[in-house]
């Protein structure tokens, strides 16, 4: 039993040294805290301390500061409400003449909602690289048609664009129009 006496002497010395360093550090921290409290009591002015109802608000608040901001009087007429109903109802839009609906469909600039298989066709490959005069005229006509389509898009009036945007403001109206397009007109 005399051969195994536990930990060697230098480990006990190291442990005692670390314990002493911990106690000294704790004493320094406590004395620093007490000294700081005394200085705060000596130099405390009423204007330096915030009242209970005051708090720090950043110029650019992040997350938590948003709810605590003091509301300023604002003119509510300046802002458009998100849940505002559009002027036209779904019934009025369905009663519109087919020619008006056709013009609205030609002016639609959004992606097609038709996901049927018939709309997904491959582009034909170019077979001939040498064109005759007749083929050249057809190409020029196709280029003119594509240019006229782009000028049509640019020539939309703001009122028609506003009507298209109003459709998306009201989900009930939007789904009504989608159902009306899917159902065949009798």
From Swiss-Prot:
Strongly expressed in thymus, and to a lesser extent in spleen, lymph node and peripheral blood lymphocytes. Present in T-cells and NK cells, but not B-cells (at protein level). Residues 29-186 are cytoplasmic. It comes from the Eukaryota. InterPro entries: T-cell_rcpt-assoc_TM_adapter-1. It is found in: Cell membrane. Changing residue 79 to F: Abolishes interaction with PIK3R1. Residues 118-128 have a biased composition (Basic residues). GO terms for biological process: adaptive immune response; cellular defense response; negative regulation of receptor recycling; negative regulation of transport; positive regulation of calcium-mediated signaling; positive regulation of T cell receptor signaling pathway; signal transduction. Residues 79-82 are annotated as: Interaction with PIK3R1. Phosphorylated on tyrosines by LCK or FYN upon TCR activation. Pfam families: SIT. Residues 116-140 are annotated as: Disordered. Residues 1-7 are extracellular. The chain crosses the membrane at residues 8-28. The modification Phosphotyrosine is found at residue 79. GO terms for cellular component: centriolar satellite; mitotic spindle; plasma membrane; T cell receptor complex. Residues 131-140 have a biased composition (Basic and acidic residues). The modification Phosphoserine is found at residue 46. Keywords: Adaptive immunity, Cell membrane, Disulfide bond, Immunity, Membrane, Phosphoprotein, Signal-anchor, Transmembrane, Transmembrane helix. It is a single-pass type III membrane protein. GO terms for molecular function: transmembrane receptor protein tyrosine kinase adaptor activity. PANTHER family: T-CELL RECEPTOR-ASSOCIATED TRANSMEMBRANE ADAPTER 1 (PTHR15951:SF2). Homodimer; disulfide-linked. Interacts with CD3Z. When phosphorylated, interacts with PIK3R1. Stabilizes the TCR (T-cell antigen receptor)/CD3 complex at the surface of T-cells. This is T-cell receptor-associated transmembrane adapter 1.
